A protein has these predicted regions:
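Residues at the starts of beta-strands that form the adenosine-phosphate
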Residues: 3, 27-29, 115
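Short loop/helix-cap segments at secondary-structure boundaries that form the rim of catalytic
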Residues: 37-44
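N-terminal Rossmann NAD(P)H-binding glycine-rich loop of SDR-like oxidoreductase domains
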Residues: 4-24
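NAD(P)H-binding glycine-rich loop region in Rossmannoid oxidoreductase-like domains
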Residues: 46-97, 101, 126-127
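Conserved acidic residues
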Residues: 2, 72-74, 114
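SDR active-site strand-loop-helix element
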Residues: 7, 31, 76-80, 116-122
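Conserved Rossmann-fold NAD(P)-dependent oxidoreductase catalytic core, especially the SDR/UDP-sugar
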Residues: 100-146
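N-terminal Rossmann-fold cofactor-binding loop
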Residues: 31-36, 52-53
Length: 149
């Protein structure tokens, strides 16, 4: 059975991805903060992995412990991040820097998955095709109009 780690698994998007991964018969690991709600993660087939992205040494220990027992993940979908905050520097700290810590740690521990998917936000594109509702494509230029995007 292939394994998948879904970070931000207790969030809106992450919890739906967890359910889909279970339907597709993956071994599912839900990467969450210790303070995260587990309300949508009650299925006994879900393995909980507490991850502290804010502290690289702690994150390294958590991932290293997993590797020692289960090896690496086949796939990782990274959707942990903040969508709202009072200080716009928090977006950079959490959504960029902590993601960098995560990827750097995976490399350092030789835990590179077959595929790593980073879930960002439509806010990156700003109001592209807002009136016509045309699909956003790779050719569209990002035009973020908020610190979040």
């Amino acid at each position: 059975m292939e394994s998948i780690l879904i970070t931000g698994a207790s969030g809106f998007i992450g919890s739906f991805i967890v359910e889909e991964a279970l339907k597709r018969k993956f071994g599912v690991w839900a990467g969450i903060r210790s303070s995260s709600s587990r309300e949508y993660l009650r299925n006994r087939k879900i393995h909980i992995l507490e991850l502290d992205f804010a502290h690289p040494n702690e994150l390294r220990a958590q991932l290293s412990g997993h590797k020692g027992t289960y090896n690496k993940f086949d796939y990782i979908i990274h959707c942990a991040g903040v969508t709202k905050c009072t200080d716009k520097r928090e977006f950079d700290r959490v959504n960029y820097l902590q993601t960098k810590y995560f990827v750097d740690t995976l490399r350092e521990l030789n835990m590179i998955p077959k595929q790593f998917i980073y879930i960002s936000t439509l806010s990156v594109f700003g109001p592209v095709h807002e009136k016509t509702y045309q699909p956003i494509t790779e050719e569209d230029s990002p035009m973020p109009n908020t610190a979040y995007g």
